[in-house]
């Protein structure tokens, strides 16, 4: 906090506040201690105004001790509470509004009056202080607010009226203490000062990625000038931030823009103490340049080269390359100052420096742990933005969320409000119907409810004031989870049980295949427990096996268990990539080709949803060169699209399916389901498929995959389970039409027998169910048989399928029997 502008009496008030906190054994200095400090200075305007309302020091002490009492013995440094910081901030704002260049006791009182949620506000309420009258009394005691340094300010800026109307004076704002402190940028500020001190071409341009703190460096220079921490050459300089949009705005006729800009330049040259700051420097190029007119950059060039105009620019690397570098004459007039992204350690220091401002604004405590979590989590999971901007945004939003959560009106108050509204409407209706006795009773009820509401509201507010709201690591994790969709909050008991039983969940849809299900489940648990390699995807798998054994189904089941919907996965059908050039569809078309602006089918989806299951289906169908693009994804967890953006794959599960080697197995007569020597068959299938996989794909690709899993062939028992699962799905579909279907075990066995095919796996079962049940049922429905609301039993008598239609009883009204 900035205490340099406090008067001696105001400084004594803060010292008294600290003494009162120590006397009362309190661990922090709050608004109540500031109020006690004001009362300890009886000659101050604040104390005199309060005394005029019959508020004395003894009364204030009595109220404070009644409200919060004495604390335990406290040892250690006293810190200001967020509300006390807010009061100091508001007092500075009041001084600025009254055009005072100092902060006195009267401004602190105005700050306490404006901050209406602390203990001091409750003391004022208990002592029946009329806030509006007290404020008017303070302003009256100060005399005419226009009589301070306004005239001096006007005379100072009279030399540059046009510039003052088009630009913000950063030095004045820095003097008011409203600029955020600049931390850890001493090297860059020193370099800017060195360039500004040159004889010619003394124009630094700050170049860096968006959000690294370029504008903050210009603000840091303004603060250094105000604090007298600059060389003699820059003392008493004014840093003016020029907005090119304001300069162009309203210039309707030719020559108007040029005239306005020339006027600004003349004022700067005559004043001799102005440093011009142009944020988004690339807007100079082309600004005001209508047909036949000269743009802003060409008007400024001569003055920039001669050193008549000191200008600081700020722009991003991309904009500098596109707009400034292509104009060599403009580029040589500026000296680049590279602004790099700060490290994690530096960002933590920056956030700790800004903590007071955010605590005062949100009125909560921000812990060191929350700051460190914000920096680490934003650095790890928000890959398309830069520190410190993304970490600051994270702290700001999390603080806002915590503040709103703690100040949401409780349900009991909302219920009383609704009851009051209801009684009020009933009373109005009774008056309208001239039922005055009933209306009088309702009026009494309304008065009673309003009193009850006020008591409950005061009780809630008192509880809120007594409670210190803090920002925790968990709050930060919640916000970043909302930004990215990646679950980062602590694992609760329900989720823990869900993760531990993930195998059972997957087996509800995938019959058999224990090896594959176990590998996938372990990868998900590792990631959720925070043990996975942070530079690689959660897991990458190749599923091998004959067609129809559940490779794609397992990927769908995983997507459903993680996101609640099996369509939530990103599916890439590799049969669409049989040509070499089709790889451009994954990362986007090259510049100059159709579709360059649309982005890649894969990269765009992952950018939008970084936490996802990606399925590359039937990989052996794609051109072999397509897989070269996946090498970096599997190893480093990132991929660069055609626009140069790095897409983060570190929070994805990559599943590739293939039935490579199936043809060779068929030739060797090992394909098929069931068999006498299942273990021996599986080993033969496994060896054959792995051998074919190595022949089909390059070793550097296979070496980057976490696990290659060969799926087992399905047994007849597993086929029967699959039939039951498919019949249950059909039952659920028919229940929507109010048809209850029961399929007997004999019918299921016959379907499994008819759908059994050693070459095609489980897929023939779908066709068998269509042929044996769905076709006949559809004929029954369309043939005029009223089977809606009835029970249909499907059985097999050894020769053919039988369909028995009967009325539903109370026991058969649910489809769960199928």
Swiss-Prot record:
Pfam families: AAA, AAA_2, AAA_lid_9, Clp_N, ClpB_D2-small. Induction: By heat shock. Transcriptionally regulated by CtsR. Up-regulated by heavy metals such as Cu(2+) and Cd(2+), but Zn(2+) and Co(2+) have no effect. Forms part of an operon with ctsR, mcsA and mcsB. The keyword Iron-sulfur does not apply. Residues 417-452 form the UVR domain. GO terms for biological process: stress response to cadmium ion; stress response to copper ion. The gene is clpC. Residues 3-144 form the Clp R domain. Residues 6-71 are annotated as: Repeat 1. ATP binds at residues 208-215, 545-552. Keywords: ATP-binding, Chaperone, Nucleotide-binding, Repeat, Stress response, Virulence. The keyword Repeat applies. Disulfide bonds: none annotated. Belongs to the ClpA/ClpB family. ClpC subfamily. This is ATP-dependent Clp protease ATP-binding subunit ClpC. Residues 471-662 are annotated as: II.
């Amino acid at each position: 906090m900035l205490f340099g502008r406090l008067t001696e009496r105001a400084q004594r008030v803060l010292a008294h506040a600290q003494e009162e906190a120590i006397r009362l054994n309190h661990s922090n200095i709050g608004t109540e201690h500031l109020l006690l400090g004001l009362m300890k200075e009886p000659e101050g305007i604040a104390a005199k105004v309060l005394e005029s309302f019959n508020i004395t020091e003894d009364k204030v002490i009595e109220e404070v001790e009644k409200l919060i009492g004495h604390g335990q013995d406290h040892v250690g440094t006293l810190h200001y509470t967020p509300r006390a910081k807010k009061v100091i901030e508001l007092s500075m704002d009041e001084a600025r509004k009254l055009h005072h260049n100092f902060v006195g006791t009267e401004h602190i009182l105005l700050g306490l009056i404006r901050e209406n949620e602390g203990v001091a506000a409750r003391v004022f309420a208990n002592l029946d202080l009329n806030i509006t009258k007290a404020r008017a009394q303070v302003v009256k005691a100060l005399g005419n607010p226009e009589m301070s340094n306004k005239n001096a300010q006007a005379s100072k800026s009279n030399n540059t009226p046009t510039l003052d109307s088009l630009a913000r004076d950063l030095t004045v704002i820095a003097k008011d203490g409203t600029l955020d402190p600049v931390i850890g940028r001493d090297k860059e500020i020193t370099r800017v000062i060195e360039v500004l001190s040159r004889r010619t071409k003394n124009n630094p341009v700050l170049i860096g990625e968006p959000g690294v703190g370029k504008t903050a460096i210009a603000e840091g220079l303004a603060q250094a000038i105000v604090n007298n921490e600059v060389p003699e050459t820059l003392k008493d300089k004014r840093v003016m931030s020029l907005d090119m949009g304001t300069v162009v705005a309203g210039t309707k006729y030719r020559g108007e823009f040029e005239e306005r800009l020339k006027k600004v330049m003349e004022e700067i040259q005559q004043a001799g103490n102005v440093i011009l700051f142009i944020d988004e420097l690339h807007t100079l190029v082309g600004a005001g340049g209508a047909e036949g007119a000269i743009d802003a950059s060409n008007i400024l060039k001569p003055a920039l080269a001669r050193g008549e105009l000191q200008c600081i620019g700020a722009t991003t690397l991309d904009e500098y390359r596109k707009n400034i570098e292509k104009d060599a004459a403009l580029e040589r007039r500026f000296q680049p100052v590279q602004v790099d992204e700060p490290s994690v350690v530096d960002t933590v220091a920056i956030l700790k420096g800004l903590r007071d401002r955010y605590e005062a604004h949100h009125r909560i405590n921000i812990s060191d742990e929350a700051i460190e979590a914000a920096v680490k989590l934003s650095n790890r999971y928000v890959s398309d933005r830069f520190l410190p901007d993304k970490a600051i945004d994270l702290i700001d939003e999390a603080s806002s969320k915590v503040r709103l959560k703690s100040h949401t009106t409780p349900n009991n108050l909302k219920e009383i409000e609704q009851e009051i509204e209801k009684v009020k409407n009933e009373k109005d209706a009774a008056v309208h119907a001239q039922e005055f006795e009933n209306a009088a009773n309702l009026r009494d009820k309304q008065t009673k409810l309003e009193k009850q509401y006020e008591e409950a509201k005061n009780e809630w507010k008192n509880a809120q004031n007594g409670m210190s709201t803090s920002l925790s690591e968990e709050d930060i994790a919640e916000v970043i989870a909302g930004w990215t969709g990646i679950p980062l909050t602590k694992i609760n008991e329900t989720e823990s049980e869900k993760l531990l039983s993930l195998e059972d969940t997957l087996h509800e849809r995938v019959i058999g295949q224990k090896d594959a299900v176990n590998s996938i489940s372990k990868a998900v648990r590792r990631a959720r427990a925070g043990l996975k390699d942070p530079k690689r995807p959660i897991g990458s798998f190749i599923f091998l096996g004959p067609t129809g054994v559940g490779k794609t189904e397992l990927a769908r089941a995983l997507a459903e268990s993680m996101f609640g919907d099996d369509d939530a996965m990103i599916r890439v059908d590799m049969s669409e990539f049989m040509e070499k050039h089709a790889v451009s569809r994954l990362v986007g078309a090259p510049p100059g080709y159709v579709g360059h602006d649309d982005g890649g089918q894969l990269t765009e989806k992952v950018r939008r949803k970084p936490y996802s299951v990606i399925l590359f289906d039937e990989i052996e169908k794609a051109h072999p060169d397509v897989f070269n693009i996946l090498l970096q994804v599997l190893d480093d967890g990132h991929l660069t699209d055609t626009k140069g953006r790095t897409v983060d794959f570190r929070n994805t599960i990559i599943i590739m399916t293939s039935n490579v080697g199936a043809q060779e197995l068929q030739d060797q007569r090992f394909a098929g389901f069931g068999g006498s020597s299942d273990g021996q068959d599986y080993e033969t299938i496994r060896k054959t498929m792995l051998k074919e996989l190595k022949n089909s794909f390059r070793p550097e690709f296979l070496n980057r995959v976490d696990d290659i899993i060969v799926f087992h062939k399905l047994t007849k028992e597993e086929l029967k389970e699959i039939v039951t699962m498919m019949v249950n799905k059909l039952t659920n579909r028919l229940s929507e039409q109010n048809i209850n279907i029961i399929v007997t075990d004999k019918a299921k066995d016959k379907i499994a027998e008819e759908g059994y095919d050693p070459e095609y796996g489980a897929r023939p079962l779908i066709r068998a169910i269509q042929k044996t049940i769905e076709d006949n049922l559809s004929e029954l429905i369309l043939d005029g048989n009223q089977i809606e609301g009835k029970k249909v039993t499907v059985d097999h008598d050894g020769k053919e399928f039988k369909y028995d239609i009967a009325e539903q009883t109370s026991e058969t009204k649910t489809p769960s029997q199928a």
